[in-house]
Amino acid sequence: MAKYISALQRIEAMFQSAIEISKKYEIIMVTSNENHTDNTNDYSDNSVKSEFFSDQEQNLIRQTLENIGFKVKQFFNEEDFISFISNPRENLSKYIVLNSAQKGTKIGRKSLIPSLCDLYSVKYIGSNPYIVSLCRDKYRTSCILKQHGIST
């Protein structure tokens, strides 16, 4: 008879795994924040600022990661992260990037950080730059899905 692991046991196993990972890696958070990210090139009708984190949300994410055991570096815009990653003063292989930054207004704005991570061989959480850009292009995504018999 197969042994079933309870949801609580699975959560505990994931938590223990995260603790082990925190011993090897640090987290870099690249996020847009409503109080710390300047975005002068915003859309007027559909502001990208609606997707920015509040200070409270930002702090909750950071505190959760730190409570697990991760050291966390914080960047509130892409430019500061670009300066850090392109002029490394330390080993970049010890980092995992958690990205939710999107300061720009063009279609590829969410693929910038994953592209740089790929260029500098830095691990990151989330989709690769191609998938991010493809999924942001609703027309092309819809065409691909229709080609495979999936209606949109």
Named regions from a protein language model:
Residues 1-123, 130, 134-136, 140:
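ATP-binding N-terminal substructure of ATP-dependent carboxylate-amine bond-forming enzymes
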Residues 137-152:
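Short, glycine-/small-residue-rich phosphate/pyrophosphate-handling segment
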